[in-house]
Regions:
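Nucleotide-activated sugar donor-binding and catalytic core shared by glycosyltransferases
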Residues: 1-180
Length: 180
């Protein structure tokens, strides 16, 4: 059986006893200001050094090199952070389940995180148009907006959450909507 503390301990011994949150940030292909996006998120995260910050690699879209370079530089000077190149599916879901929150702009914040009742701080416009749940807190690119959404997510009471991507006949419903 998977144990997230054992997994974190394998990554870094300090992680097994600490609270943590996950960072999943990908390039915004519509907007070209990925450098400012990652800079503002990382600047905002400096206020949360009492948490372990677990970063994942960005996807391979144009602009991912900028994001990855900034994350690696951040990690060099922030000993409470770790970068994981690739999670296994089960490991990712277990880590997400016990994470204080997920921050970034990943679709995982709209699909898996609500299902696991993990709050999401969604930064920017990459996920614009997706249905929101009670556990998703949008933030603009501004540091003040990001910090405000982090504070809200840390005070989020895990409870029953509306799940937008589950239910009976989901495939038929999606197909019906796509046909219209």
């Amino acid at each position: 059986k998977f144990n997230e503390r054992d997994y974190l301990s394998k990554i870094n011994k300090k992680l097994e006893k600490c609270r943590y949150f996950m960072v999943s940030l990908h390039p915004e292909t519509i907007a070209s200001n990925n450098h400012q996006l990652v800079k503002n998120i990382l600047t905002s995260l400096k206020k949360y050094k009492n948490f372990i910050q677990v970063f994942s690699y960005p996807n391979s879209d144009t602009g991912s090199d900028i994001i990855l370079k900034e994350i690696k530089n951040y990690i060099k000077s922030n000993k409470n952070s770790v970068l994981i190149p690739s999670y296994g599916r089960e490991e990712y879901l277990h880590l997400l389940r016990y994470s204080e929150f997920l921050i970034g702009n990943s679709s995982s914040g709209f699909i898996e995180a609500p299902y696991l009742n993990t709050p999401t701080v969604n930064v920017g416009i990459r996920q614009k148009g997706r249905p929101l749940t009670k556990s998703i807190f949008n933030a603009s690119y501004a540091c003040s907006s990001i910090i405000k959404s982090i504070k809200i997510s840390l005070n989020y009471k895990k409870s029953d959450n509306t799940i937008n991507y589950k239910g009976k006949n989901t495939i038929n419903t999606v197909l019906r909507i796509l046909k219209t």
